[in-house]
Amino acid sequence: MGRRILFITTDQQRYDTLGVNGGQLSRTPVLDKLAAQGIRYERCQPTSVVCMPSRSSMLTGQFPSTHGAWMNGVPLAIDAPSVAENLHDAGYATALIGKAHFEPFMDPFGLYAENALANLGIPTIEQDWFDGRRGVHRGFDYLEFATHGVMGPLHYAKYMNEHHADAITGFYQVVDHSLNVNAAGGGDTGAPQVKFNPVPREWYHTDWVADRTIRWLEEQRDDRDWFCWMSFPDPHHPWDPPKSEIARVPWREVPLPVNYPESASEREALLDAKARHWREWYDGRVVSNYEAPAKWVPSTLTSDQVREVNALNAVEVELIDEAIGRVLKSIEAKGWGDDVDVIFTSDHGELQGDFGLLFKGPYHVDGLMRLPLIWRPALSTKPEPSVVRAPVSLVSLAATFLDVAGKPAPSWAEGAVLPSSDDEAKARSFDATFTEWDSSFFGIDVHVRTVVTEDYLYTEYLPGTMHDGSEGELYVLGDDPLQRVNRFDDPALASVRATLAEQLAGHEHRPGERATPGILMAPV
Protein backbone atom coordinates (compact mmCIF):
# COMPACT_ATOMS: atom_id res chain seq x y z
CA MET A 1 0.00 0.00 0.00
CA GLY A 2 0.97 3.60 -0.49
CA ARG A 3 -0.22 6.34 1.80
CA ARG A 4 -3.50 8.22 1.88
CA ILE A 5 -3.38 11.69 0.33
CA LEU A 6 -5.40 14.79 1.21
CA PHE A 7 -4.71 17.42 -1.44
CA ILE A 8 -6.08 20.83 -0.46
CA THR A 9 -6.30 23.75 -2.86
CA THR A 10 -7.67 27.23 -2.62
CA ASP A 11 -8.31 29.61 -5.48
CA GLN A 12 -6.32 32.79 -6.04
CA GLN A 13 -4.41 32.85 -2.74
CA ARG A 14 -1.14 34.70 -2.27
CA TYR A 15 1.92 33.35 -0.51
CA ASP A 16 1.82 36.11 2.10
CA THR A 17 -1.71 35.38 3.32
CA LEU A 18 -0.53 32.64 5.71
CA GLY A 19 0.86 33.44 9.12
CA VAL A 20 3.76 31.05 8.61
CA ASN A 21 4.68 33.02 5.47
CA GLY A 22 4.68 36.35 7.26
CA GLY A 23 1.02 37.24 6.78
CA GLN A 24 -0.36 39.65 9.37
CA LEU A 25 -4.09 39.80 8.53
CA SER A 26 -5.35 36.20 8.74
CA ARG A 27 -4.99 33.78 11.62
CA THR A 28 -4.05 30.43 10.08
CA PRO A 29 -3.04 28.15 12.97
CA VAL A 30 -4.02 24.91 11.22
CA LEU A 31 -1.93 25.52 8.12
CA ASP A 32 0.89 27.00 10.19
CA LYS A 33 1.00 23.77 12.24
CA LEU A 34 1.10 21.63 9.09
CA ALA A 35 4.04 23.71 7.87
CA ALA A 36 5.85 23.29 11.20
CA GLN A 37 5.42 19.52 10.99
CA GLY A 38 6.47 19.17 7.36
CA ILE A 39 7.95 21.01 4.40
CA ARG A 40 7.27 24.64 3.56
CA TYR A 41 8.23 25.95 0.15
CA GLU A 42 9.25 29.59 -0.06
CA ARG A 43 9.10 29.96 -3.82
CA CYS A 44 6.43 27.83 -5.42
CA GLN A 45 5.34 29.05 -8.85
CA PRO A 46 2.32 28.18 -10.99
CA THR A 47 2.48 27.16 -14.63
CA SER A 48 -0.12 29.87 -15.35
CA VAL A 49 -1.61 32.71 -13.34
CA VAL A 50 -5.21 31.80 -14.21
CA CYS A 51 -7.40 28.95 -13.03
CA MET A 52 -8.01 26.50 -15.86
CA PRO A 53 -4.46 26.21 -17.21
CA SER A 54 -2.97 26.02 -13.70
CA ARG A 55 -5.45 23.45 -12.40
CA SER A 56 -5.00 21.37 -15.52
CA SER A 57 -1.26 21.36 -14.82
CA MET A 58 -1.85 20.05 -11.30
CA LEU A 59 -3.92 17.20 -12.71
CA THR A 60 -1.70 16.34 -15.68
CA GLY A 61 1.78 17.21 -14.46
CA GLN A 62 2.24 19.17 -17.68
CA PHE A 63 2.65 22.79 -18.72
CA PRO A 64 -0.26 24.51 -20.49
CA SER A 65 1.63 24.48 -23.79
CA THR A 66 1.72 20.69 -23.46
CA HIS A 67 -1.74 19.83 -22.10
CA GLY A 68 -3.47 22.35 -24.38
CA ALA A 69 -5.76 24.19 -21.92
CA TRP A 70 -3.96 27.47 -22.56
CA MET A 71 -6.56 29.98 -21.32
CA ASN A 72 -9.65 30.14 -19.14
CA GLY A 73 -12.56 28.95 -21.25
CA VAL A 74 -10.41 26.37 -23.07
CA PRO A 75 -11.43 22.91 -21.78
CA LEU A 76 -8.81 20.35 -20.91
CA ALA A 77 -9.24 17.50 -23.40
CA ILE A 78 -11.31 14.71 -21.90
CA ASP A 79 -8.58 12.19 -22.73
CA ALA A 80 -5.74 14.32 -21.34
CA PRO A 81 -3.46 12.60 -18.82
CA SER A 82 -4.72 12.61 -15.24
CA VAL A 83 -2.82 11.62 -12.13
CA ALA A 84 -6.14 10.52 -10.66
CA GLU A 85 -6.34 7.82 -13.35
CA ASN A 86 -2.94 6.49 -12.28
CA LEU A 87 -3.98 6.51 -8.63
CA HIS A 88 -7.27 4.82 -9.49
CA ASP A 89 -5.31 2.10 -11.32
CA ALA A 90 -3.16 1.71 -8.19
CA GLY A 91 -6.27 0.86 -6.18
CA TYR A 92 -6.95 4.25 -4.64
CA ALA A 93 -10.44 5.56 -4.00
CA THR A 94 -10.44 8.97 -5.67
CA ALA A 95 -12.55 12.07 -5.07
CA LEU A 96 -12.59 15.74 -6.02
CA ILE A 97 -14.86 17.92 -3.91
CA GLY A 98 -15.18 21.65 -4.54
CA LYS A 99 -13.82 23.64 -7.45
CA ALA A 100 -12.44 21.66 -10.39
CA HIS A 101 -12.51 24.05 -13.38
CA PHE A 102 -10.96 21.82 -16.01
CA GLU A 103 -13.99 22.71 -18.14
CA PRO A 104 -15.81 26.02 -18.71
CA PHE A 105 -18.43 27.21 -16.23
CA MET A 106 -20.41 29.03 -18.92
CA ASP A 107 -22.00 25.95 -20.45
CA PRO A 108 -25.76 26.48 -20.89
CA PHE A 109 -26.27 23.19 -22.73
CA GLY A 110 -24.42 21.04 -20.19
CA LEU A 111 -21.86 19.83 -22.70
CA TYR A 112 -19.25 19.16 -20.03
CA ALA A 113 -19.37 16.58 -17.27
CA GLU A 114 -18.50 19.13 -14.59
CA ASN A 115 -21.73 20.95 -15.38
CA ALA A 116 -23.91 17.87 -15.89
CA LEU A 117 -23.22 15.61 -12.91
CA ALA A 118 -25.27 17.54 -10.34
CA ASN A 119 -28.40 17.38 -12.48
CA LEU A 120 -27.74 13.76 -13.43
CA GLY A 121 -27.52 12.88 -9.75
CA ILE A 122 -24.60 10.47 -10.19
CA PRO A 123 -21.15 10.60 -8.53
CA THR A 124 -19.13 10.30 -11.76
CA ILE A 125 -19.45 9.37 -15.43
CA GLU A 126 -17.48 7.13 -17.77
CA GLN A 127 -15.18 8.89 -20.24
CA ASP A 128 -12.20 8.17 -22.48
CA TRP A 129 -8.86 7.95 -20.71
CA PHE A 130 -5.43 9.01 -21.91
CA ASP A 131 -4.35 5.44 -22.67
CA GLY A 132 -7.39 4.61 -24.81
CA ARG A 133 -9.38 2.83 -22.10
CA ARG A 134 -12.63 4.14 -20.68
CA GLY A 135 -13.08 4.82 -17.00
CA VAL A 136 -14.47 7.19 -14.40
CA HIS A 137 -14.29 10.90 -15.29
CA ARG A 138 -10.63 11.99 -15.23
CA GLY A 139 -9.96 9.11 -12.82
CA PHE A 140 -12.30 10.26 -10.04
CA ASP A 141 -14.80 7.83 -8.49
CA TYR A 142 -16.61 10.66 -6.76
CA LEU A 143 -17.16 14.28 -7.78
CA GLU A 144 -19.05 17.13 -6.13
CA PHE A 145 -18.50 20.58 -7.56
CA ALA A 146 -18.68 24.14 -6.31
CA THR A 147 -17.45 27.48 -7.55
CA HIS A 148 -17.77 31.15 -6.68
CA GLY A 149 -21.15 31.95 -5.20
CA VAL A 150 -23.93 29.97 -6.86
CA MET A 151 -22.62 30.09 -10.43
CA GLY A 152 -23.45 27.30 -12.84
CA PRO A 153 -25.39 24.03 -12.55
CA LEU A 154 -22.99 22.62 -9.97
CA HIS A 155 -23.65 20.62 -6.82
CA TYR A 156 -23.31 23.57 -4.44
CA ALA A 157 -25.70 25.69 -6.51
CA LYS A 158 -28.16 22.79 -6.56
CA TYR A 159 -27.84 22.43 -2.78
CA MET A 160 -28.56 26.12 -2.25
CA ASN A 161 -31.49 26.11 -4.69
CA GLU A 162 -33.06 23.07 -3.08
CA HIS A 163 -32.47 23.91 0.58
CA HIS A 164 -31.80 27.64 0.95
CA ALA A 165 -33.19 29.34 -2.15
CA ASP A 166 -33.98 32.55 -0.27
CA ALA A 167 -30.28 33.01 0.53
CA ILE A 168 -29.08 32.92 -3.08
CA THR A 169 -29.60 36.63 -3.72
CA GLY A 170 -27.18 37.40 -0.89
CA PHE A 171 -24.23 36.30 -3.02
CA TYR A 172 -22.47 38.68 -5.38
CA GLN A 173 -23.45 38.11 -9.00
CA VAL A 174 -20.08 37.29 -10.56
CA VAL A 175 -21.15 37.81 -14.16
CA ASP A 176 -23.57 40.56 -15.21
CA HIS A 177 -26.47 40.28 -17.65
CA SER A 178 -24.14 41.05 -20.56
CA LEU A 179 -21.99 38.04 -19.59
CA ASN A 180 -19.17 40.36 -18.58
CA VAL A 181 -17.39 40.02 -15.26
CA ASN A 182 -19.47 42.24 -12.99
CA ALA A 183 -17.94 45.63 -12.21
CA ALA A 184 -20.52 46.63 -9.58
CA GLY A 185 -19.11 47.81 -6.29
CA GLY A 186 -20.30 47.11 -2.77
CA GLY A 187 -19.37 46.94 0.87
CA ASP A 188 -18.56 50.16 2.69
CA THR A 189 -16.18 51.50 0.03
CA GLY A 190 -17.80 50.56 -3.28
CA ALA A 191 -14.94 48.20 -4.11
CA PRO A 192 -15.56 46.01 -7.16
CA GLN A 193 -16.77 42.44 -6.59
CA VAL A 194 -17.51 43.14 -2.91
CA LYS A 195 -20.79 42.45 -1.14
CA PHE A 196 -21.97 41.96 2.42
CA ASN A 197 -23.51 38.49 2.21
CA PRO A 198 -26.23 37.61 4.75
CA VAL A 199 -25.86 33.86 4.13
CA PRO A 200 -25.25 31.93 7.37
CA ARG A 201 -21.71 30.64 7.63
CA GLU A 202 -22.80 26.99 7.72
CA TRP A 203 -24.41 27.38 4.27
CA TYR A 204 -21.42 29.13 2.69
CA HIS A 205 -19.40 27.13 0.17
CA THR A 206 -16.26 26.95 2.35
CA ASP A 207 -18.06 24.98 5.05
CA TRP A 208 -20.06 23.06 2.42
CA VAL A 209 -16.84 21.80 0.79
CA ALA A 210 -15.50 20.72 4.18
CA ASP A 211 -18.80 19.06 5.13
CA ARG A 212 -18.98 17.09 1.88
CA THR A 213 -15.34 16.06 2.23
CA ILE A 214 -15.94 14.82 5.76
CA ARG A 215 -18.94 12.83 4.58
CA TRP A 216 -16.92 11.17 1.81
CA LEU A 217 -14.05 10.37 4.18
CA GLU A 218 -16.42 8.79 6.69
CA GLU A 219 -17.56 6.37 3.98
CA GLN A 220 -14.04 5.13 3.16
CA ARG A 221 -12.79 1.72 4.25
CA ASP A 222 -9.78 1.21 6.49
CA ASP A 223 -8.27 -1.30 4.07
CA ARG A 224 -8.15 0.98 1.01
CA ASP A 225 -5.96 3.98 0.29
CA TRP A 226 -7.58 7.16 -0.94
CA PHE A 227 -6.77 10.38 -2.74
CA CYS A 228 -9.07 13.27 -1.91
CA TRP A 229 -8.73 16.64 -3.63
CA MET A 230 -10.56 19.16 -1.44
CA SER A 231 -10.78 22.39 -3.42
CA PHE A 232 -12.08 25.63 -1.89
CA PRO A 233 -13.40 28.35 -4.27
CA ASP A 234 -12.18 31.16 -1.98
CA PRO A 235 -10.39 33.56 -1.53
CA HIS A 236 -10.97 34.27 -5.24
CA HIS A 237 -13.27 37.19 -5.97
CA PRO A 238 -16.07 37.99 -5.43
CA TRP A 239 -15.26 38.93 -1.88
CA ASP A 240 -18.61 38.13 -0.28
CA PRO A 241 -18.00 36.01 2.83
CA PRO A 242 -20.80 35.66 5.39
CA LYS A 243 -21.52 39.06 6.89
CA SER A 244 -21.51 37.48 10.34
CA GLU A 245 -17.76 36.89 9.98
CA ILE A 246 -16.45 40.19 8.61
CA ALA A 247 -15.81 41.73 12.03
CA ARG A 248 -12.85 39.34 12.35
CA VAL A 249 -10.76 41.77 10.28
CA PRO A 250 -12.04 45.38 10.50
CA TRP A 251 -11.08 46.91 7.18
CA ARG A 252 -10.45 50.40 8.58
CA GLU A 253 -7.63 48.92 10.69
CA VAL A 254 -5.97 47.12 7.78
CA PRO A 255 -2.64 48.63 6.69
CA LEU A 256 -2.09 49.23 3.01
CA PRO A 257 0.01 46.60 1.25
CA VAL A 258 3.72 47.34 1.13
CA ASN A 259 3.54 47.26 -2.67
CA TYR A 260 0.64 49.70 -2.97
CA PRO A 261 1.98 53.14 -3.92
CA GLU A 262 -0.40 55.70 -2.41
CA SER A 263 0.65 58.40 -4.87
CA ALA A 264 -0.95 58.16 -8.31
CA SER A 265 2.19 59.57 -9.88
CA GLU A 266 4.31 56.88 -8.21
CA ARG A 267 1.93 54.16 -9.39
CA GLU A 268 2.06 55.47 -12.93
CA ALA A 269 5.85 55.69 -12.93
CA LEU A 270 6.15 52.08 -11.73
CA LEU A 271 3.73 50.86 -14.39
CA ASP A 272 5.43 52.86 -17.13
CA ALA A 273 8.66 50.97 -16.40
CA LYS A 274 6.96 47.68 -17.27
CA ALA A 275 5.55 46.43 -20.57
CA ARG A 276 2.94 48.78 -21.97
CA HIS A 277 -0.15 46.65 -21.28
CA TRP A 278 0.32 47.28 -17.52
CA ARG A 279 -0.27 51.02 -17.82
CA GLU A 280 -2.90 50.71 -20.53
CA TRP A 281 -5.00 48.39 -18.37
CA TYR A 282 -4.53 50.68 -15.37
CA ASP A 283 -5.83 53.63 -17.41
CA GLY A 284 -8.73 51.66 -18.85
CA ARG A 285 -7.46 51.85 -22.43
CA VAL A 286 -7.35 48.08 -22.97
CA VAL A 287 -8.98 44.97 -21.58
CA SER A 288 -6.40 42.27 -22.11
CA ASN A 289 -8.21 39.38 -20.45
CA TYR A 290 -11.45 38.18 -18.84
CA GLU A 291 -9.91 37.89 -15.40
CA ALA A 292 -11.11 41.31 -14.21
CA PRO A 293 -14.28 43.33 -14.84
CA ALA A 294 -14.09 44.77 -18.37
CA LYS A 295 -15.89 47.95 -17.32
CA TRP A 296 -13.73 48.58 -14.27
CA VAL A 297 -10.80 50.98 -14.55
CA PRO A 298 -7.98 50.17 -12.09
CA SER A 299 -6.93 53.81 -11.77
CA THR A 300 -10.21 54.43 -9.92
CA LEU A 301 -9.19 52.05 -7.12
CA THR A 302 -8.95 53.87 -3.79
CA SER A 303 -6.79 53.08 -0.79
CA ASP A 304 -9.89 52.34 1.30
CA GLN A 305 -11.12 49.90 -1.33
CA VAL A 306 -7.77 48.12 -1.16
CA ARG A 307 -8.12 47.90 2.62
CA GLU A 308 -11.65 46.49 2.41
CA VAL A 309 -10.79 43.92 -0.25
CA ASN A 310 -7.79 42.74 1.76
CA ALA A 311 -9.86 42.52 4.94
CA LEU A 312 -12.54 40.38 3.29
CA ASN A 313 -9.89 38.25 1.64
CA ALA A 314 -8.34 37.67 5.06
CA VAL A 315 -11.70 36.64 6.50
CA GLU A 316 -12.10 34.07 3.73
CA VAL A 317 -8.61 32.70 4.42
CA GLU A 318 -9.45 32.28 8.11
CA LEU A 319 -12.66 30.41 7.30
CA ILE A 320 -10.71 28.06 5.03
CA ASP A 321 -8.13 27.39 7.76
CA GLU A 322 -10.89 26.52 10.22
CA ALA A 323 -12.61 24.28 7.67
CA ILE A 324 -9.34 22.41 7.06
CA GLY A 325 -9.05 21.94 10.81
CA ARG A 326 -12.46 20.26 10.92
CA VAL A 327 -11.50 17.89 8.11
CA LEU A 328 -8.23 16.95 9.83
CA LYS A 329 -10.13 16.21 13.05
CA SER A 330 -12.45 13.90 11.13
CA ILE A 331 -9.40 12.08 9.74
CA GLU A 332 -8.03 11.68 13.26
CA ALA A 333 -11.39 10.35 14.41
CA LYS A 334 -11.13 7.62 11.77
CA GLY A 335 -7.74 6.62 13.21
CA TRP A 336 -5.80 7.84 10.19
CA GLY A 337 -4.16 10.89 11.76
CA ASP A 338 -0.59 9.61 11.36
CA ASP A 339 -1.07 7.97 7.98
CA VAL A 340 -2.15 10.79 5.65
CA ASP A 341 0.05 13.03 3.54
CA VAL A 342 -1.43 16.53 3.42
CA ILE A 343 -0.45 18.87 0.60
CA PHE A 344 -1.79 22.42 0.48
CA THR A 345 -1.44 25.05 -2.23
CA SER A 346 -3.33 27.45 -4.50
CA ASP A 347 -3.62 27.71 -8.27
CA HIS A 348 -2.34 31.31 -8.54
CA GLY A 349 -2.26 34.55 -6.58
CA GLU A 350 -4.07 37.90 -6.58
CA LEU A 351 -2.71 41.43 -6.99
CA GLN A 352 -4.67 42.80 -3.99
CA GLY A 353 -3.51 46.38 -4.46
CA ASP A 354 0.03 45.72 -5.71
CA PHE A 355 0.97 48.51 -8.14
CA GLY A 356 -2.55 49.92 -7.66
CA LEU A 357 -4.19 46.87 -9.26
CA LEU A 358 -6.65 44.12 -8.36
CA PHE A 359 -7.51 40.71 -9.78
CA LYS A 360 -5.10 38.98 -12.20
CA GLY A 361 -3.94 38.86 -15.78
CA PRO A 362 -0.73 38.83 -17.85
CA TYR A 363 1.29 40.34 -14.99
CA HIS A 364 4.07 37.97 -13.94
CA VAL A 365 5.07 39.23 -10.51
CA ASP A 366 5.06 37.67 -7.06
CA GLY A 367 1.52 38.77 -6.20
CA LEU A 368 0.27 36.36 -8.85
CA MET A 369 3.15 33.90 -9.08
CA ARG A 370 4.43 33.24 -5.57
CA LEU A 371 2.18 30.67 -3.94
CA PRO A 372 1.80 28.97 -0.58
CA LEU A 373 2.87 25.32 -0.72
CA ILE A 374 3.01 23.01 2.28
CA TRP A 375 3.64 19.27 2.26
CA ARG A 376 3.11 17.51 5.58
CA PRO A 377 4.13 13.88 4.95
CA ALA A 378 2.35 11.25 7.00
CA LEU A 379 3.57 11.54 10.58
CA SER A 380 4.22 7.79 10.64
CA THR A 381 7.14 8.46 8.27
CA LYS A 382 8.69 10.77 10.90
CA PRO A 383 9.19 13.70 8.50
CA GLU A 384 12.04 16.11 9.14
CA PRO A 385 10.58 19.65 9.16
CA SER A 386 12.29 21.83 6.60
CA VAL A 387 12.04 24.96 4.47
CA VAL A 388 12.83 24.72 0.76
CA ARG A 389 14.02 28.01 -0.70
CA ALA A 390 14.78 26.69 -4.18
CA PRO A 391 12.11 27.41 -6.81
CA VAL A 392 9.55 24.66 -7.33
CA SER A 393 6.47 24.41 -9.53
CA LEU A 394 2.92 23.13 -9.30
CA VAL A 395 3.80 20.98 -12.31
CA SER A 396 5.58 18.69 -9.79
CA LEU A 397 2.42 17.78 -7.90
CA ALA A 398 1.32 14.86 -10.08
CA ALA A 399 4.68 13.10 -9.78
CA THR A 400 4.69 13.80 -6.04
CA PHE A 401 1.26 12.21 -5.51
CA LEU A 402 2.40 9.09 -7.35
CA ASP A 403 5.61 8.96 -5.33
CA VAL A 404 3.56 9.02 -2.12
CA ALA A 405 1.51 6.17 -3.58
CA GLY A 406 4.70 4.21 -4.25
CA LYS A 407 4.35 4.53 -8.01
CA PRO A 408 6.75 5.95 -10.60
CA ALA A 409 5.97 9.12 -12.50
CA PRO A 410 4.58 8.38 -15.97
CA SER A 411 6.49 9.38 -19.07
CA TRP A 412 4.06 12.19 -19.84
CA ALA A 413 4.67 14.04 -16.56
CA GLU A 414 6.94 17.07 -17.03
CA GLY A 415 7.42 17.77 -13.33
CA ALA A 416 9.71 15.89 -10.96
CA VAL A 417 8.82 14.84 -7.40
CA LEU A 418 9.03 17.79 -5.01
CA PRO A 419 12.25 17.95 -2.97
CA SER A 420 11.94 17.58 0.78
CA SER A 421 14.89 19.83 1.65
CA ASP A 422 17.04 22.55 0.16
CA ASP A 423 19.99 20.17 -0.07
CA GLU A 424 17.89 17.73 -2.06
CA ALA A 425 16.62 20.55 -4.26
CA LYS A 426 20.17 21.58 -5.10
CA ALA A 427 21.30 18.00 -5.68
CA ARG A 428 18.39 17.45 -8.07
CA SER A 429 18.85 20.78 -9.89
CA PHE A 430 15.66 22.53 -8.84
CA ASP A 431 17.02 25.86 -10.05
CA ALA A 432 14.30 27.36 -12.27
CA THR A 433 10.54 27.33 -12.82
CA PHE A 434 8.51 28.44 -15.82
CA THR A 435 5.18 30.23 -16.12
CA GLU A 436 3.22 30.71 -19.33
CA TRP A 437 0.45 33.05 -20.44
CA ASP A 438 -1.50 33.04 -23.68
CA SER A 439 -4.74 34.94 -24.18
CA SER A 440 -6.89 36.10 -27.03
CA PHE A 441 -9.73 38.35 -26.02
CA PHE A 442 -11.48 41.46 -27.34
CA GLY A 443 -9.14 41.33 -30.34
CA ILE A 444 -6.08 41.53 -28.10
CA ASP A 445 -3.50 38.75 -28.10
CA VAL A 446 -0.94 38.56 -25.29
CA HIS A 447 1.76 35.91 -24.97
CA VAL A 448 4.10 35.86 -21.96
CA ARG A 449 6.85 33.50 -20.82
CA THR A 450 8.65 33.77 -17.49
CA VAL A 451 11.50 31.97 -15.79
CA VAL A 452 12.11 32.33 -12.04
CA THR A 453 15.33 31.34 -10.31
CA GLU A 454 16.47 31.91 -6.74
CA ASP A 455 17.93 35.25 -7.80
CA TYR A 456 15.94 36.53 -10.77
CA LEU A 457 12.50 36.87 -12.29
CA TYR A 458 12.74 37.23 -16.08
CA THR A 459 9.85 37.73 -18.51
CA GLU A 460 9.67 37.90 -22.29
CA TYR A 461 6.66 39.14 -24.24
CA LEU A 462 6.21 37.20 -27.45
CA PRO A 463 4.81 38.95 -30.54
CA GLY A 464 1.08 39.70 -30.40
CA THR A 465 -1.26 42.63 -30.76
CA MET A 466 0.18 44.32 -27.64
CA HIS A 467 3.88 43.52 -28.02
CA ASP A 468 6.36 43.18 -30.86
CA GLY A 469 8.61 40.64 -29.14
CA SER A 470 11.26 43.09 -27.96
CA GLU A 471 9.74 43.89 -24.55
CA GLY A 472 10.47 42.20 -21.27
CA GLU A 473 11.01 42.50 -17.54
CA LEU A 474 13.94 41.50 -15.35
CA TYR A 475 13.99 41.80 -11.57
CA VAL A 476 16.81 41.06 -9.16
CA LEU A 477 14.86 39.39 -6.36
CA GLY A 478 17.42 39.95 -3.61
CA ASP A 479 17.60 43.70 -4.25
CA ASP A 480 14.04 44.19 -5.47
CA PRO A 481 11.67 41.72 -3.79
CA LEU A 482 8.64 43.81 -4.82
CA GLN A 483 9.60 43.80 -8.52
CA ARG A 484 9.55 47.58 -8.86
CA VAL A 485 12.78 48.18 -10.80
CA ASN A 486 12.70 46.66 -14.28
CA ARG A 487 16.29 46.01 -15.36
CA PHE A 488 15.50 44.32 -18.66
CA ASP A 489 17.51 46.92 -20.59
CA ASP A 490 20.27 47.35 -17.99
CA PRO A 491 23.66 46.73 -19.71
CA ALA A 492 25.10 45.60 -16.38
CA LEU A 493 22.79 42.57 -16.49
CA ALA A 494 23.28 41.71 -20.15
CA SER A 495 24.99 38.39 -19.42
CA VAL A 496 22.37 37.48 -16.80
CA ARG A 497 19.62 38.30 -19.28
CA ALA A 498 21.27 36.15 -21.94
CA THR A 499 21.47 33.19 -19.58
CA LEU A 500 17.83 33.54 -18.53
CA ALA A 501 16.74 33.95 -22.14
CA GLU A 502 18.54 30.73 -22.96
CA GLN A 503 16.69 28.96 -20.15
CA LEU A 504 13.37 30.24 -21.48
CA ALA A 505 14.27 29.10 -24.98
CA GLY A 506 15.07 25.68 -23.59
CA HIS A 507 11.62 25.53 -22.02
CA GLU A 508 9.91 26.66 -25.23
CA HIS A 509 11.73 24.05 -27.30
CA ARG A 510 11.73 21.20 -24.77
CA PRO A 511 11.28 17.71 -26.22
CA GLY A 512 8.08 15.71 -25.99
CA GLU A 513 4.67 15.50 -27.57
CA ARG A 514 2.20 18.33 -27.08
CA ALA A 515 -1.55 18.31 -27.34
CA THR A 516 -3.19 20.39 -30.02
CA PRO A 517 -4.09 23.71 -28.34
CA GLY A 518 -7.71 23.61 -27.24
CA ILE A 519 -10.46 25.79 -28.67
CA LEU A 520 -11.79 28.72 -26.66
CA MET A 521 -15.36 27.65 -25.85
CA ALA A 522 -16.46 30.21 -23.25
CA PRO A 523 -15.15 33.29 -21.43
CA VAL A 524 -14.46 31.30 -18.28
Write out the residue ranges for each language-model feature:
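Formylglycine-dependent sulfatase
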Residues: 1-461, 467-470, 482-502, 521-523
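Residues forming the ATP-binding cleft of Hanks-type serine/threonine protein kinase domains
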Residues: 478
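Short, charged, surface-exposed hinge/linker loops at domain edges
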Residues: 513-524
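A short N-terminal helical cap/helix-turn-helix that marks the beginning
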Residues: 508-509
